[in-house]
Amino acid sequence: YNGKPILIDTTSFEMYQNGPWKAYRQFCEHFLAPLALMSKKDVRLFQLLLSNIDGIPLDIAAEIVPKSTFTNFGLAAHIHAHAKAQKHYEDKKVKKQKLGKMQLLGIVENLKSTIKNLKIKQETEWADYYNDTNYSDIAEKDKQIIVKNFLKKCSSEIVVDLGANDGKFSNIAAENSYVVSMDIDPIAVNTNYLKHNPKIIPIVTNFANPS
C-alpha cells in the first residue's frame, strides 16, 4: 500500500510466552535461507521457493551456499548448525527446551543484523538497462513523449507495464495512474521498488513460467 508491503498474516501474532520460538525454523526457511542464497550464490535461487512453498529446506541451503558462510556467525548458526540439528534430531523425541526472553531477543537481534548485512552484488541483464541502452538522448526523450501522449489518451486508472526493467516508464505512467510494474529480473525489480513510488507495485514475473 502506497509503495510499502502490508503484513496480512495477522493470525501469526500471539501473546508472548516463555519458551522456544515456534516459528524459528519457518522464518529461517522462508526468509533467511532465500536471502542468503541470493546474496552469497545467485540471485535466481529465489525461484526455489516456487517448488518449496513451505520454505527452502535448510539442508539444501547449507549445501548450496559457499563454504565461506561458515565464517559468518549468523549464517553458521541459523543455517549450517540449524540444518545439522534438524538432521540429528529428526527421528528423536526432544524435550521442550527452556528459553528466556533475553535469549529469544538475542536470537531475533542476530537474525536482524545477519539479514541487514546480506547484499546482492550480482549484475543482471536488465538491471542497468537504461544506462547501457543504445538509445540516443533524443530518441529516449521522443519515446517518453510518445508514451506520455498515449497514456493521456487512454486515461486508465490502472496501467500494467510488462518488461518494466527498473521502472523508468512505470514512473511516467504513475503520474496519472496506478501501475503494476512487472519484470523477470529481480535486481531490476528491486531497483524499481527502492524508488518507493506509492503508485507503483513492482513484481518479479516470468510470463513464460508463471507461478
Regions found by a protein language model. Name each.
Residues S155-N165:
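Conserved class I S-adenosyl-L-methionine
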Residues Y1-S39:
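Catalytic activation segment of kinase domains across protein kinase-like and atypical kinase folds
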Residues K116-A139:
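Class I SAM-dependent transferase core
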Residues T191-S211:
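S-adenosyl-L-methionine
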Residues Y178-D183:
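Conserved SAM-binding motif I beta-strand of class I
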Residues Q26-K119:
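N-terminal auxiliary segments of SAM/dcSAM-dependent transferases
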